[in-house]
């Protein structure tokens, strides 16, 4: 097994684990979400106790499903959590959809849909006001897109630009890889087109995207999830 994995190699590992019966997709998603929280608390010990506030950006795939697990687990720990969903939940993969439903059933009033595939400027302004307006947000989690992304995120430009404009107002955490970073580097030339991570939490092994975009990843922590 190579020390650095491509997206296709990681997916092959996951598929082999599912096919062997070693783990289900839901179990793996739960482990991934918990491992992000473990890494967050290891990196920022002051967040492990007390009341804090998180904003979670969830995308249309399994990375978004990880985000819903993170939201639920932080809420259970006593955090104030707001989710922004960049997806049609009915079109999400089965396991991601299940975790969406678990979150919405738990806290129905704390999820805000944003237009997919193109975020409206007014929605980005609302996101900025709610996430950064009162200066109390502690953590922004990027669970929009994971490894293997191969197209620019032009529809998300207003959200990404808002994150960059408030770069020092919160601790920015990327799940697996910062959104907007492809396997060979940024998918667009502008620095603000990639989520500005302070911490990137990836699973099993470092990924090729990290090596080609180190300046966007912040601190990289590899978490083992039983593959």
From Swiss-Prot:
Obligatory cofactor(s): K(+)
Disulphide bonds in the chain: none
Catalysed reactions listed for this entry: (6R)-NADHX = (6S)-NADHX; (6R)-NADPHX = (6S)-NADPHX
Primary gene name: nnrE
Family statement drawn from the similarity comment of this UniProt entry: Belongs to the NnrE/AIBP family.
Residues the entry annotates as binding K(+): 63, 142, 179
Pfam families named in the record: YjeF_N (PF03853)
Keyword Hydrolase among UniProt keywords: no
Function: Catalyzes the epimerization of the S- and R-forms of NAD(P)HX, a damaged form of NAD(P)H that is a result of enzymatic or heat-dependent hydration. This is a prerequisite for the S-specific NAD(P)H-hydrate dehydratase to allow the repair of both epimers of NAD(P)HX.
EC number: 5.1.99.6
Alphabetic keyword roster: Isomerase, Metal-binding, NAD, NADP, Nucleotide-binding, Potassium
Enzyme class of the recorded protein, top EC level: isomerase
Highest taxon above the source species: Bacteria
Residues reported in the UniProt entry to bind (6S)-NADPHX: 62-66, 146-152, 176
UniProt remark on cofactor binding: Binds 1 potassium ion per subunit.
Species the sequence originates in: Roseobacter litoralis (strain ATCC 49566 / DSM 6996 / JCM 21268 / NBRC 15278 / OCh 149)
UniProt-listed InterPro entries: YjeF_N_dom, YjeF_N_dom_sf, YJEFN_prot_NAXE-like
Protein name: NAD(P)H-hydrate epimerase
UniProt GO molecular function: metal ion binding; NAD(P)HX epimerase activity; nucleotide binding
